[in-house]
């Protein structure tokens, strides 16, 4: 556990203490669950403390997995977490439209739907 403030709805710890703890570790894989994803705005969230933790996890991870259901694509939220990056693995459900999937693929973003 990192310590910090507990965000019950997200079941996570956040805040300056949590961020400082994460400064001292490296992780193999991180799973990020954004509020929204769009080609124009990137990976986004709606709670600043939670977004800070997501940013830090991306920074300290060897592999980054972005998991979002299909309803979150081509939507925006309040705070940008990160740019879309072809090195990340994007996981969604099979409900994503063929058109949206093709647009992302043509921009170098591969979506795993299985």
What is each PLM-predicted segment?
Residues 1-114:
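Conserved phosphate- and dinucleotide-binding cores of soluble alpha/beta proteins
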């Amino acid at each position: 556990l990192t310590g910090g403030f507990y965000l019950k709805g997200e079941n996570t710890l956040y805040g300056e203490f949590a961020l400082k703890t994460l400064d001292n570790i490296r992780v193999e894989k991180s799973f990020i669950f954004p509020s929204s994803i769009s080609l124009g705005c990137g990976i986004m969230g709606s709670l600043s403390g939670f977004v800070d933790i997501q940013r830090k996890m991306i920074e300290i991870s060897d592999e980054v997995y972005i998991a979002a259901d299909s309803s979150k694509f081509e939507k925006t939220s309040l705070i940008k977490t990160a740019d879309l990056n072809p090195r990340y693995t994007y996981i969604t459900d099979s409900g994503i439209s063929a058109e949206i999937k093709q647009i992302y693929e043509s921009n170098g973003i591969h979506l795993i739907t299985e």
